[in-house]
Every structure is written in C-alpha cells, then in structure tokens.
Amino acid sequence: MPNLEKEFHNGVNGLNGNTKIENDGCVNPHSLGIIGGGWYGCHIAATLLALGFRVKLFEQHERLLHEASGNNQFRLHMGFHYARHSGTRLQSRDGFLRFVEHYPELSRIVPYNIYAVPTQDSLLDYNTYKAIMASSGVAFTEGAPDGVHITNVDGIMCVPERVLLLTKARAYFEAALKGALELGRKVSSIQEADDGVLIDGEGFDFVVDATWGHYMDLDLQVIYEATLLLYYEGPPEFPAVTLVDGPLASVYPTEVPGVFTLSSVPHTPLGQFKTAAEARAARDGVSPATISAKRALMEEQIMHYLPTFLETFRYIGPQLAVKTKPLGAYDDRSCRVSRRGRMFSVMSGKIDTIFFAHERILSLIDDES
C-alpha cells in the first residue's frame, strides 16, 4: 500500500491555501467511522475523505462544533500559553502555520494581541518567559500599542495569534463532508468484529473516537472539567489581553466584532470530575447565583491589570462547556492518538494540533496494511 501521508503532502488531495478539499478520484479500500463532530472529528474526516477513504462522521447534535469545539476562547494558538511544556509549544507553533495555510478563511488576524507577564502573580519573570518564547521560534514584538493601559505587569509583548471563525468553519465542513455526515445521531454501541468494527451495526474497518473520552475511556489519566467563560460587549478595536504564566486571566475577541470572552484559570472551572457524565451534570445544573459569584471574582481579577475593564465592557452572558484535561501540573496540552485494536482515540488540548492527529492515524493504518 502506498504511503498515505506522503501522498497527502504531495497534494493529491487538493488541500491548499484556498481552503478547498477535493477528492482525486482514487478510492482507498479502507472505511472509517468517526464519532464526534468537533474540530478534530471534522478535520480527520475531511482529510481521509479527500484521500479516498470511505468515511462517515457521527455527531449527536444537529450541528457541527457544538460542544467544547464551539465553546472556548476561539484562540488559534502559537504556543505562548505553554511556557512550561516544550512539546505543546512546538506542536502549537507548527500547527498554527499549517492551519493558516490549509484553512486560511477559518481564522482572522487579531490586530493587537497582547501577552503580559505580571510583576508578582506570574510563575515566571518576564525575561525568563521571553527567553523561552524566543528559543521556541515564535514571532513577537515587545511593548504595548499606544493607548492601552495595563498595570502591575513586568513586561508586554504583541503576538500574531489569530481568532477562529466558527460560523465559517461549520459551513465549510458541512460542505466538505456532504454525504458523509450523520447529524443528530448519537452512537449507541461499538462492537469489534473479526475484520472490523460495528457502529450501531454498521461495519467499518476502523473507528476514530474524537469525543475526548465522552464515549470511550481514554488510555491516560484525565479529569473532566465543567467550565464557565463570560461574554462581554466592548470596543471592536480593543486588544486581546492575556496574562501569563500561571493562575491568571485573559480577554479575547470572538468572530463577532465587539464581542469578547473573559476567562480565568482559577475561576473558569466549575469543578473537576472523574467522569464526563458528572461534568456535564455540573455544567447543565449551574445556578444563576454561581454565575454571578464567578463573574464578580473574574472581573476583580482582570481589573488588577485592566483597571478600566468595567468602564469599557458590558456583560452579556455565560458560556458553558466541558473540557477534558490530562492529570498533571506540567501544562501538557499536546496531541495524542492511542489505539486499541481497530479503534483510535484522539486527545488534545488545542485546535492547532489537528494535523498531528490525522498524520498519526494514517501512520497507524499504514502499519496495519
């Protein structure tokens, strides 16, 4: 069997800078069922479909990118968040460049994108943080734009990270996966057979679980975290402001001009749980009183660095989600693909490592052949 990843990079799939996937007419003998229509499920399905695989994507909701993929800060990372984990930084840096190349219409530039290191509250001083980023090969400039008032920080840099465009992404993947999508379809059973895997009785050569442990258990220790972000309305030209490194906060724009999210490392979590079901119950059962209390804490925290925050922004409402995170204090959000028989499980902390995931799956299928 030919090397599938080599064919992919040589362009037989037509994936290029115009955000276009075309099938070259060559049919691959393998079929894959993919569970979960988030960023990873959609990208893996579209890539394999373009390579000639027979693919079906199962998503329990009526639209794609409905769960954690559509409820986050919508940041396309370059690695600046991860001063304490080199593997995550390098995957983010490389994944960012590939994402912009392959999906140029699914993100946009954030004109003023600030990372600031607090004087007292950061786990790293500014010069150490700067040295780590410089050695990682990511671009940045030092100093804040004119007119931005940030207090209690040791140093500031501006970075070229982007914001994801969720509405365009949904439309794009729905078109790219036309005929291969099962929306509103919750998978009831997966059974291994002698020569494949059955999803609700339908046969596939391989199955990819892209639900982050919401369907099948993962092969590493994780926790499921119910989360709360807050939406605010503010000046469209206001910069993104991210405080690093440690238990800090950030203000980041969304795809809608003038709408931002506020996130806080200590206050965004609603609780950590051993099972996805427990985390979903906590998310769905959060009370208005809890949201109000969390909002007060998050606003107090961000105003230590942006003292005019409440004068500049108006609260709109909450964003609720469940995240899957590996256990450990070392800040690992790198991408992993594990295999049990003919079933693959994907686990990653960030959108920018989607390319690593599909490459690893192709490699494992090649090994099987």
From Swiss-Prot:
<dbReference type="InterPro" id="IPR036188">
    <property type="entry name" value="FAD/NAD-bd_sf"/>
</dbReference>
<keyword id="KW-0274">FAD</keyword>
<comment type="pathway">
    <text>Secondary metabolite biosynthesis.</text>
</comment>
<comment type="function">
    <text>FAD-dependent monooxygenase; part of the gene cluster that mediates the biosynthesis of the gamma-pyrones fusapyrone (FPY) and deoxyfusapyrone (dFPY). FPY is an undecaketide and thus likely synthesized by the polyketide synthase FPY1 from acetyl-CoA functioning as starter unit and the addition of 10 malonyl-CoA extender units by successive Claisen-condensations.</text>
</comment>
<dbReference type="GO" id="GO:0004497">
    <property type="term" value="F:monooxygenase activity"/>
</dbReference>
<dbReference type="Pfam" id="PF13450">
    <property type="entry name" value="NAD_binding_8"/>
</dbReference>
<keyword id="KW-0285">Flavoprotein</keyword>
<keyword id="KW-0560">Oxidoreductase</keyword>
<protein>
    <recommendedName>
        <fullName>FAD-dependent monooxygenase FPY4</fullName>
        <ecNumber>1.14.13.-</ecNumber>
    </recommendedName>
</protein>
<comment type="similarity">
    <text>Belongs to the aromatic-ring hydroxylase family.</text>
</comment>
<keyword id="KW-0503">Monooxygenase</keyword>
